[in-house]
């Protein structure tokens, strides 16, 4: 299990990688079509259709701009300084520069949290706490969307980035324990055989209180 110094290193090196490769990342992802993911989250948010959305790990701001163009109030959260600056410039939205492991979020504030290709960077021992913080920042009944590269619960470094590659059952256990109920899940890209769909997307609704245990050792027990 990583110690506090190791967690600091994990965050610092991952953010440094993104800062060093910010322009290449933007060029490689700016035209990605994630409209399926955006629609999947918005479909389940209840209430007047001008929602307050937290784009958790907003990167250079592609999806912030998309939410704004759909008429929603979008706020970005990004740990990498270069991404945060790019997101502000590209989207015109407010962007909070925060490390995922050192969050400072308002309570009961957002209708939806859009975590597209981001939560897999959170070490498994810290994931229960981070999910509880996302639960708390949502309004009651609010919606969490996540999409992560899937695997068999491997955890470690891959091309300069730290990641955890959960399978569906493990991911369900973590998110359910943090006080969410699953609404739907699917694999991406659409229309391909399952073995060619590396992304697991899922949509969750916030319950009033977390139901599960906060001990990550018990969360991962079979």
Pin down the residues of each PLM region:
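A short acidic, Gly/Pro-enriched loop at the edge of an enzyme's catalytic core
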Residues: 101-113
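Acceptor-substrate binding/catalytic loop of class I
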Residues: 154-170
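Class I SAM-dependent methyltransferase SAM/SAH-binding core
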Residues: 60-102
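Core SAM-dependent methyltransferase catalytic element
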Residues: 190-221
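Conserved beta-strand signature within the Rossmann-like core of class I S-adenosyl-L-methionine
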Residues: 141-148
């Amino acid at each position: 299990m990583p110690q506090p110094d190791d967690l600091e290193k994990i965050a610092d090196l991952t953010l440094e990688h993104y800062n060093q490769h910010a322009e290449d990342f933007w060029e490689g992802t700016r035209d990605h079509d994630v409209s399926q993911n955006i629609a999947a989250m918005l479909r389940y948010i209840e209430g007047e259709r001008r929602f307050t959305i937290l784009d958790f790990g907003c990167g250079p701001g592609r999806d912030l701009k998309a939410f704004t163009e759909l008429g929603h109030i979008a706020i970005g959260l990004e740990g990498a300084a270069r991404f945060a600056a790019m997101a502000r410039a590209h989207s015109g939205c407010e962007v909070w520069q925060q490390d995922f492991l050192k969050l400072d979020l308002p309570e009961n504030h957002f209708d939806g949290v859009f975590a597209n290709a981001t939560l897999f960077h959170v070490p498994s021992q810290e994931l229960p706490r981070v999910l509880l913080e996302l639960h708390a920042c949502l309004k009651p009944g609010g919606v969490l969307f996540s999409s992560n590269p899937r695997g068999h619960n491997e955890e470690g470094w891959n091309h300069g980035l730290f990641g955890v590659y959960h399978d569906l059952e493990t991911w369900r256990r973590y998110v359910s324990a943090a006080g969410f109920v699953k609404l739907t899940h699917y694999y991406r890209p659409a229309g391909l055989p399952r073995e060619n769909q590396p992304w697991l997307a899922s949509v969750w609704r916030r319950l009033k209180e977390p139901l599960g245990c906060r001990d990550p050792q018990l969360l991962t027990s079979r």
